[in-house]
Regions:
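Bacterial N-terminal signal peptides
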Residues: 9-16
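Intrinsic disorder/low-complexity segments
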Residues: 1, 13, 270-272
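Bacterial N-terminal signal peptides that target proteins for export
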Residues: 1-7
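Single conserved hydrophobic/aromatic residue that forms the stacking wall/gate
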Residues: 264-276
């Protein structure tokens, strides 16, 4: 597997994150330095209004850019075959048409975008079981269903230098250039979901597992693995810092385990055959 690194929405400030240093990160052979990106002023940010249509178009452009600048695995690879086995029968989730892909990068990460694109890093697939991978997928789809991803995309656009280059003084959003999409990727990499959003996404991931007849403990196991990884990571690493800044992660792990336990201790256990 190629040692590529990529910037994506910070999907877990508790769920999944990279163990590698972003200083090594390159896109298309070029290092991205957000400090060199021109920032528009506060007044310009307030002046921009983004519609749902703008966000949808932006999400599509963003995913096309991400798939171009990251090594998307082919169907005949081990990762491609495993992905097909896990997601081949999932075409739509709660009205959202979804498509899946694997980036052959070593990051332990995954994310979903507002256009229904779900991308999983090979690094995450390497350390997790099939059910755990799907729990993470359910969590990420939950962020989209709850509009967390759409809000993150909007906020990243407003915070990034994209707004300056794309016309901060204009009331409309123009098609984004390659450099502007790179700047947005930087902004999305620094995005963080609230604890409430993460907990709700955990719940969605849990229900996703139940609906698809997967291990009810998969969400707990996935979260617990990530928590253990953070404990093993170097003290000053980005991975460790991310988890240390979210002390409630351990509570999320415990909560996920409790939900799975309750499924079996309830007087009328739920049928986990996939019907609801």
């Amino acid at each position: 597997m190629k040692k590529n690194f990529f910037i994506i929405t910070a999907v877990v400030c508790g769920m999944s994150c990279t163990t590698t240093a972003y200083a090594q990160f390159k896109i298309g052979g070029k290092k991205i330095n957000v400090n060199k990106v021109v920032q528009a002023g506060t007044d310009a940010v307030k002046a921009i209004s983004l519609s749902d249509a703008d966000i949808a178009a932006m999400s599509k452009e963003y995913m096309e850019w991400m798939d171009t600048h990251n090594p998307l695995t082919k169907p005949d690879t081990d990762y491609g075959k495993r992905l097909e086995k896990l997601t081949g029968n999932i075409k739509e989730v709660d009205g959202l048409k979804v498509n899946f892909g694997v980036y052959e990068v070593i990051d332990v990460n995954a994310f979903a975008c507002g256009d229904g694109s779900v991308r999983i890093c090979a690094g995450l697939m390497d350390i997790m079981t099939d059910d755990e991978v799907m729990a993470v997928v359910g969590h990420e789809i939950g962020h989209v269903i709850h509009t967390d991803s759409k809000d993150a995309m909007k906020n990243a656009y407003l915070r990034s230098a994209v707004k300056n280059a794309a016309g901060a003084a204009s009331s409309t959003v123009s098609k984004l250039s390659d450099s502007e999409l790179g700047a947005m990727a930087e902004a999305l990499a620094g995005a963080q979901y609230s604890q409430k959003q993460e907990t709700e996404a955990d719940d969605y991931g849990f229900e996703f597992c139940i609906k698809n007849n997967l291990d009810p403990y998969a969400m707990y196991n996935a979260l617990n693995k990530l928590l253990e990884l953070s404990a093993e990571a170097p003290k000053e690493s980005k991975f460790q810092k991310m988890f240390s800044s979210h002390p409630d992660t351990a509570k999320r792990v415990a909560r996920a385990k409790e939900k799975a336990c309750l499924l079996y201790t309830s007087p009328s256990p739920r049928d986990i055959s996939g019907s609801r």
